Regions:
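Gly/Ser-rich catalytic/binding loops embedded in alpha/beta enzyme cores
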Residues: 2-175
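Conserved small/polar residues in nucleotide/adenosyl-binding loops
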Residues: 181-183
Length: 183
């Protein structure tokens, strides 16, 4: 089964019906990301250990007859430009001097997690989010999966490339500053 061809809601339904486990979903997308990310550079940070741990907890919940949520087991990506997940590194778009560790979960992640989604990593963004292209000195450019000769534009380019290449179902996208949310 090509999981990337399902909708997020369809995948969540399959997980809740115990047709596929959340752990299997994470393993599937880990393999897919490992095969495809090097050509587009959508991700700056991946944490499949955390994702598998969350998937095992969700699987246990479902196996005990509890509902996992509409997005049960659905992999999501968080944007490196914004605060994301407690304990994960933050570079604010690849700015070495601003490297920190997030001290709280983002609003997007809390909402996605409440529906059963599982964060697998952080996506590339331009430094401070202030460029029409997704490129920075720390991680380099992100390409569109449709033509790797082109840059995935704007501050959410890593998120957009990850979703459009079927590496995750949902990804945190940006703030609208100077109109680049639509590049």
């Amino acid at each position: 089964m090509n999981l990337e061809n399902l909708s997020a809601l369809d995948l969540g339904e399959l997980v809740n019906k115990k047709i596929i486990s959340p752990v299997e979903v994470i393993e599937y997308f880990e393999k897919r990301i490992n095969e495809r990310n090097s050509s587009i550079n959508a991700f700056t940070y991946l944490n499949f250990e955390d994702a598998r741990s969350e998937a095992r907890l969700l699987e246990d919940k479902i196996m005990h007859g509890n509902y996992g949520g509409k997005l049960a087991g659905v992999p999501v990506a968080l944007k490196d430009f914004l605060p994301t997940k407690k304990g994960w590194p933050a570079t604010h778009g690849g700015v070495k001097s601003l490297q920190t560790i997030d001290d709280a979960d983002s609003e997007f992640y809390r909402a996605a997690r409440s529906l059963g989604a599982i964060a697998i990593g952080k996506t590339n963004a331009p430094s401070f989010g202030f460029r029409g292209t997704t490129d920075n000195k720390m991680f380099g450019p992100t390409s569109t999966p449709f033509n790797t000769q082109y840059n995935s534009g704007g501050s959410s380019g890593g998120s957009c490339a990850a979703v459009s290449d079927g590496l995750v179902y949902l990804a945190e996208v940006g703030i609208r500053e100077i109109g680049r949310a639509h590049v």
